[in-house]
Amino acid sequence: MTIGNLSKAWTVETWMLFLRDQSALLQHPGAHHKTLLLQAHELYRAQVIERDDLCDLLELADSALAYAVETLLEESGNV
């Protein structure tokens, strides 16, 4: 799955699949994070998830971004 061909009808399962897409995460961590945040808020606005679920998804997105930054720094030898 790439950022360019995302479905407009996301589900929680779609969101979780994109979260676990390590290739997209490491190639474009900022765009990946932004997409996760936007889609989590969209799921909330569409009343697919509740506020507590939104908080959980946002925390997972932030953790994925932190992981990507740490991994990329380690790979570049800057840690």
Where are these regions (language model features)?
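Acidic, Ser/Pro/Thr-rich low-complexity regulatory regions
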Residues: M1-V79
